[in-house]
Regions:
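Short C-terminal tail/terminal secondary-structure segment
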Residues: 92, 230, 241-267
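Residue(s) in the substrate-gating loop at a strand-loop-helix junction
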Residues: 143
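Conserved glycine-rich cofactor-binding loop
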Residues: 7, 14-16
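Substrate-binding pocket helix/loop in short-chain dehydrogenase/reductase
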Residues: 93-95, 102-107, 210
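C-terminal helical subdomain
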Residues: 183, 204-236, 240, 247-249
Length: 267
């Protein structure tokens, strides 16, 4: 098993990618601290069983981040992996309809949250790596919107672009520690955050249009993103550092076009 006896924290573990990742880490032998601002995190931990602990936490609160890491240290004797996944969308308002309070809150959770995770988890992961002679990993959840925002939310897109840059900066500043820092960049994924989009498409008989701009022509499932996070956290990615891995069905590989523009049709 890839994470046998490893100590892992997953934030945003109450639903979506975080829940799928927490379950996947445990299935691979990890002891997991499941953290989320909602009570749903208790269900995730219960699903996993004795290998999991649950804690309510606000990803953008330094006090809560410190408290969550302390739980992992107390329960599991150290920390090997931090998956800083918690985030919020902030809606789809354009620049002119986005007020300072909204963008501040999105940045607090989506960007300051990963910053705090790195700041407080990295020293513990480095300490564990030195003790074991191995390495540790921090994985952040960014977004394809942080690579190429298109017409998306300015608050969300800016926050996720910041996460990508933060992963790169942290990888450099943790030089020599054997702690790797990478980010996953999901495309449209069926989670609690995007549930209204998928539900509307199903009700309207238009589910085939979800994700139509990417070459796979579908949205992702949380388990697919979880597997990407596990890869980056695992020894299989031992030489992958400071990278932003797009897991978006190919959306970011090109500017959005349709075959009709070139006089061709889909195969």
């Amino acid at each position: 098993m890839r994470f046998e006896n490893k100590s892992v924290i997953v934030t945003g573990a109450g639903s979506g990618i975080g829940r799928a990742a927490a379950i996947a880490f445990a299935r691979e032998g990890a002891r997991v601290v499941c953290a989320d601002i909602t009570a749903a995190v208790e269900d995730t931990a219960a699903t996993i069983g004795t290998a999991a602990r649950a804690i309510r936490m606000d990803a953008g609160s330094e006090e809560d981040v410190v408290r969550t890491i302390a739980l992992a240290l107390d329960a599991h004797g150290g920390l090997d992996v931090m998956f800083a996944n918690a985030g919020i969308s902030g809606g789809m308002a354009n620049i002119f309809d986005t007020d300072v309070a909204l963008i501040t809150e999105v940045l607090r959770v989506n960007l300051i949250g990963p910053f705090l995770a790195i700041k407080h988890a990295a020293p513990e992961i480095a300490r564990r790596a030195k003790e074991t002679g191995g390495g540790g990993a921090i994985v952040l959840t960014a977004s394809v919107a942080g690579i190429r925002s298109g017409a998306g939310s300015p608050a969300y897109s800016a926050s996720k672009a910041g996460v990508i840059n933060l992963a790169q900066v942290a990888a450099q500043q943790l030089s020599g520690s054997n702690v790797r820092v990478n980010a996953i960049c999901p495309g449209l994924t069926e989670t609690g955050m995007t549930k209204p989009v998928f539900d509307y498409a199903r009700d309207a008989g238009k589910i085939d249009r979800v994700g139509r701009l990417n070459p796979l022509r579908r949205g992702a499932q949380p388990e697919e993103l979880a597997e990407a996070a596990l890869f980056l956290a695992s020894d299989a990615a031992s030489y992958v550092n400071g990278q932003a891995l797009a897991v978006d069905g190919g959306l970011s590989s090109s500017h959005p076009v349709t075959r009709q523009e070139y006089g061709t049709t889909a195969a």
